[in-house]
Amino acid sequence: MRLILLGPPGAGKGTQAQRLVHHHGIVQLSTGEMLRAAVAAGTPVGLKAKDVMASGGLVPDDVVIGIISDRLDQSDAKNGFILDGFPRTVPQAEALDRLLKSKNLKLDAVVELCVNESALLQRVESRVAEMTARGEQVRADDTPEVLSKRLASYRALTEPLIHYYSERGKLLTVDGMMPIEQVTRDIYRVLEEAIGASDVQSRGKGAG
């Protein structure tokens, strides 16, 4: 099973990714972690990334794709993967498609966790109010104002990507505002319906 999990800040993406990893024996591929590992290992693409990062620049897409390519060749990725943090743009999605095609692999699905932004913001406001009432310090990056900016940034960046995968029949949407267990069940259900993953539901029953 080869998946991309999309969702804005606060959608619970990390929790759901870990559940899928645990129940299906697949790996979570975080571009940040892969970059750091490639740099530490001194691979050719890792050395390229190191030079760029040392100068304070953004790592080019072709270098990131090279690192993903190397990672997909490792034995633990043979059962499948969940990509985390990539792609973020349509050109990156196109490059990923070309990479997978070159390895005779295909992307099974892109799962988007949808959220009600105003409800998310209300949750944060309530939490901040409770912490303030208890005299606890609120982190500067854990405020409604910061979350609002992050949500707007995510929306602007991801909408073209969602359209790209929707056009290709890969996009599956799940309500990320439900309780964690319900979101997990819904992800298993849409995956089973979309790609015929008959063991998704049965293997997912132990989630929790």
UniProtKB/Swiss-Prot annotation:
Q: Which InterPro entries match?
A: Adenyl_kin_sub, Adenylat/UMP-CMP_kin, Adenylat_kinase_CS, P-loop_NTPase
Q: Which residues cross the membrane?
A: none
Gene Ontology biological process: AMP salvage
Q: Any idea which UniProt keywords this protein has?
A: ATP-binding, Cytoplasm, Kinase, Nucleotide biosynthesis, Nucleotide-binding, Transferase
Q: Which residues bind AMP?
A: 31, 36, 57-59, 85-88, 92, 139, 150
Region annotated NMP sits at 30-59
Task: Give any Gene Ontology cellular component.
Answer: cytoplasm
Query: Any idea of its EC number?
Result: 2.7.4.3
Q: Which Pfam families match?
A: ADK
Provide the protein's localization: Cytoplasm
SUPFAM superfamilies (alphabetical)? P-loop containing nucleoside triphosphate hydrolases
Which reaction is recorded as catalysed by this protein?
Answer: AMP + ATP = 2 ADP
Q: Which segment of the chain is annotated as a signal peptide?
A: none
The enzyme class is transferase
PROSITE patterns named in the record:
ADENYLATE_KINASE
Q: What is known of its domains?
A: Consists of three domains, a large central CORE domain and two small peripheral domains, NMPbind and LID, which undergo movements during catalysis. The LID domain closes over the site of phosphoryl transfer upon ATP binding. Assembling and dissambling the active center during each catalytic cycle provides an effective means to prevent ATP hydrolysis.
The record ties this protein, via NCBIfam families, to: adk, PRK00279.1-3, PRK14527.1, PRK14531.1, PRK14532.1
Function, as annotated, reads:
Catalyzes the reversible transfer of the terminal phosphate group between ATP and AMP. Plays an important role in cellular energy homeostasis and in adenine nucleotide metabolism.
Q: How does it assemble?
A: Monomer.
The family annotation for this protein states: Belongs to the adenylate kinase family.
Q: What protein does this entry describe?
A: Adenylate kinase
Which gene is annotated as encoding this protein in its UniProt record? adk
